[in-house]
Amino acid sequence: MSQSLLDRFGTPLERVHLAIDRLRQGRGVLLVDDENRENEGDLIFPAETITPAQMAMMIRECSGIVCLCLTEDKLKQLELPQMVSDNTSANQTAFTLSIEARQGVTTGVSAADRVTTIRTAVADDCRPDDLARPGHVFPLRARPGGVLTRRGHTEGTVDLMRMAGYKPAGVLCELTNEDGTMARLPEIITFAERHYLSVVSIEDLALALESHMEKSA
């Protein structure tokens, strides 16, 4: 990864602290992975606080496949199975069945409807019956252990939400360029500066978590 581009947002630990601060303000963060992996940046928001305006930004600026990152325990509570029994995707992205709130939505595809679905799903008292299947929100299962187990955007999103004091649930969507191609780090940095967003890498998160574990040992 081109560290020189990320350096304008501080050191790895400073980038993590800045991302946590922005999330606590209810703002979005761009989470990037290694250029030898997906080499993509995901716009992420806390599931608890995402607004219709923020969702509209995700739909407008990103790929359109809005995902809700959840823990295994939460997915068991919602009785959401994996989309396929044999996951053959290159990066083992763990999609479940897609969902829609049963109440409070129309077609389910608008920004407001997707926020309603997300708020419904992450509520502590949400029951499986509160969600229709399929729908326009795509849950993802985060592996236990977070980015120290899998260097994925899903795990990074859940880890960041925990670090910011939220429920371990976040919303993500992959940033794209105007021509529909995937945004790479230079474009991600430009987008972040234009919209006053912070950028943090999955490797930054792993470093912060490993450092915390060493201090706690």
From Swiss-Prot:
Top enzyme class: lyase
Which regions span the lipid bilayer? none
Native organism = Syntrophotalea carbinolica (strain DSM 2380 / NBRC 103641 / GraBd1) (Pelobacter carbinolicus)
Indicate which residues the UniProt annotation says bind Mg(2+) 2: 38, 153
Q: Which InterPro entries match?
A: DHBP_synth_RibB-like_a/b_dom, DHBP_synthase_RibB
Per its record, what are the GO molecular function terms? 3,4-dihydroxy-2-butanone-4-phosphate synthase activity; magnesium ion binding; manganese ion binding
Is Magnesium one of the keywords UniProt gives this record?
yes
**Reaction it catalyzes:** D-ribulose 5-phosphate = (2S)-2-hydroxy-3-oxobutyl phosphate + formate + H(+)
> Can you tell me which residues the record assigns to a coiled coil?
none
Binding residue positions for D-ribulose 5-phosphate: 37-38, 42, 150-154, 174
UniProt-annotated site: Essential for catalytic activity, residues: 136, 174
Q: Which domain of life does the UniProt lineage start with? A: Bacteria
Q: What note does UniProt attach to the cofactor annotation?
A: Binds 2 divalent metal cations per subunit. Magnesium or manganese.
Gene3D superfamilies, alphabetized: DHBP synthase
How it assembles, according to the record, is: Homodimer.
**Encoded by which gene?**
ribB
What is an annotated GO biological process for this record, any one? riboflavin biosynthetic process
Keyword check for Metal-binding = yes
Give the record's keywords alphabetically: Lyase, Magnesium, Manganese, Metal-binding, Riboflavin biosynthesis
EC id: 4.1.99.12
* Name recorded for this polypeptide: 3,4-dihydroxy-2-butanone 4-phosphate synthase
Q: Which family does it belong to?
A: Belongs to the DHBP synthase family.
Q: What cofactor(s) does the depicted protein rely on?
A: Mg(2+); Mn(2+)
Pathway, per record: Cofactor biosynthesis; riboflavin biosynthesis; 2-hydroxy-3-oxobutyl phosphate from D-ribulose 5-phosphate: step 1/1
Naming one, the record's GO cellular component terms include: cytosol
